[in-house]
UniProtKB/Swiss-Prot annotation:
Gene Ontology BP terms: rRNA processing
Entries under SUPFAM superfamilies matching the protein: Metalloproteases ('zincins'), catalytic domain (SSF55486)
Protein name: Endoribonuclease YbeY
Pfam families reported in the protein's UniProt record: YbeY
Organism of provenance: Streptococcus thermophilus (strain ATCC BAA-250 / LMG 18311)
Record keywords, A-Z: Cytoplasm, Endonuclease, Hydrolase, Metal-binding, Nuclease, Ribosome biogenesis, rRNA processing, Zinc
Classification lineage: Bacteria, Bacillati, Bacillota, Bacilli, Lactobacillales
Top-rank taxon, per record: Bacteria
Top EC class, one word: hydrolase
E.C. number: 3.1.-.-
Length: 165
């Protein structure tokens, strides 16, 4: 999985960036999404607040904002068209590979790590996986959805080695 990583804060360590890349790749393999692309931007609470207001109409900072990429146009070609035009096939493959972007508030991650009594590394990993699952269609609006999403999220974090400490 290709992840474009941007640190708007200038405060995220190389270890956290590496962990985030590895964890997202691990989660992508688990979901069969290893050939996909996404972006992760680390932000402050102030920036998170702005984004939350812009995209979710919620006037407060949040820990992670997940923006799933859904192309406006549903473009399909039959196998014959793609076989006759290899450049088109390649272009469509690239078009389908981008799945979305995450904005992770490092301030919220620190606050929540302290509040929940685990490490900052664990919280950053949790937020990355949580956001990644949202981008891939998981949600927690109903008890059933929550059980499925939170179960998968815990399974990924535990298998990766980021347990609650």
């Amino acid at each position: 999985m290709y992840v474009e990583m941007i640190d708007e804060t200038g405060q995220v360590s190389e270890e956290i960036k590496k962990q985030t890349l590895e964890l997202l790749d691990f989660a992508a393999q688990k979901l069969g999404k290893k050939d996909k692309e996404m972006a992760v931007t680390f932000v402050t609470n102030e920036r998170s607040h702005e984004l939350n207001l812009e995209y979710r109409d919620t006037d407060r900072p949040t820990d992670v904002i997940s923006l799933e990429y859904k192309p406006e146009l549903d473009i399909t070609f039959d196998e014959e068209d793609l076989a006759e035009n290899p450049e088109l096939a390649e272009m469509m493959g690239e078009f389908d590979s981008y799945i979305g972007e995450l904005f992770i508030s490092i301030d919220k991650a620190r606050e929540q790590a302290e509040e929940y009594g685990h490490s900052y590394e664990r919280e950053m990993g949790f937020l990355a996986v949580h956001g990644f699952l949202h981008i891939n269609g998981y949600d927690h609006y109903t008890p059933e959805e929550e059980a499925e999403m939170f179960g998968l999220q815990e399974e990924i974090l535990t298998a990766y080695g980021l347990t609650r400490q």
